[in-house]
A protein has these predicted regions:
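Active-site phosphate-binding strand-loop segment of PLP-dependent enzymes
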Residues: 1-79, 84-91
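PLP-dependent aminotransferase class I/II
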Residues: 3-10, 14-18, 23-29, 36, ...
Length: 228
């Protein structure tokens, strides 16, 4: 599709690739495509904090222009809520730094000439700052990240062993080029083949004290996007 867009004169500005469930994408290949077709590469790394790609824990900013983290309570580490953006691009860093705090500019030459007290807002920004308590919690969690990920992998091994003889279930793929962070362990089921209804399965599992979830309903199926 990138080649097709190029042929008709359309430019792709950015591509977002998701390390879904904790499994890193093929980032080296994606990086080569971004160079070839001149687009920004964004790594949605929210599920894969603690994963490694080709034995590199810091693979995110090595291959992508922007890496996004989520520190929601169910993620591999948490600050209670919130997240972060990682980048090695100074221009992107400066832009994000402004956007996170109402786009208040205290550092430009124009502002400095007005006096040390002066600041300016040139466009709409946001209130996306983590507070000190959230940061302290995040730092304490970060120190235990390796243990958290190891525990998730141990649990995943138990699931794999339990379902190893169930050919009607498709388990998460473990690529040989990466180490999985197992934010999720999605099991895919062919409901037509198994002759099981999804709602019946969910209700039965709930009776057993196990809450299942669908991860995720595709964005294009939500009315907000449909109405666009």
């Amino acid at each position: 599709k990138l080649k097709k867009y190029q042929m008709i004169g359309k430019k792709v500005s950015a591509v977002i690739a998701v390390d879904f469930a904790g499994q890193p994408c093929q980032w080296e290949e994606l990086s080569k495509l971004s160079e070839k077709y001149d687009f920004k590469l964004i790594n949605d790394n929210c599920h894969a904090i603690g994963a490694s790609y080709k034995n590199d824990l810091g693979y995110g900013v090595k291959f992508a222009d922007i890496v996004t983290h989520s520190y929601h309570p169910v993620k591999n580490i948490t600050t209670g809520e919130g997240g972060a953006i990682l980048t090695n691009d100074k221009k992107i860093f400066d832009k994000v730094k402004l956007l996170r705090s109402h786009n208040i500019d205290r550092e430009s030459n124009k502002t400095k000439n007005q006096g040390a007290w002066h600041y300016d807002v040139t466009q709409l920004g946001y209130n996306y700052r983590l507070n000190d308590l959230q940061c302290a919690l995040g730092i304490s969690q970060l120190k235990r990240l390796e243990r958290f990920v190891k525990s998730r992998n141990n649990i995943a091994d138990i699931y794999r062993d339990h379902f190893k003889d169930c050919d009607k279930y498709i388990l998460p793929n473990q690529n040989n080029y990466s180490d999985h962070a197992y934010h999720l362990f999605p099991i895919r089921i062919n409901f037509l083949e198994t002759k099981i209804q999804r709602t019946s399965l969910f209700e039965k599992m709930k009776e057993l004290g196990i809450n299942l979830q669908v991860h995720y309903i595709p964005i294009y199926k939500h009315h907000y996007i449909k109405d666009k």
